[in-house]
């Protein structure tokens, strides 16, 4: 996994702040593979419904970028209990829980 301990801590803290204490954050995509280089940070966040996704995403990014250097971060949000879409199934299958 190509994230530093400080980045992991920042992601988890920002997710708790924006999405709540029960949010589960997974890293997926190229950053999971230590042999690859570059790439954005792909995060899957599983949350308890209901959620104001727009507000929570904005709050998450603000909290995250106050803790780490801004960079390309893609966030996929899934409400717990909902049928995952194809892209979300990849995150569940290949992702690493932070």
Placement of each model-derived feature along the sequence:
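Catalytic core of pol beta-like nucleotidyltransferases
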Residues: 1-26, 32-38, 48-98
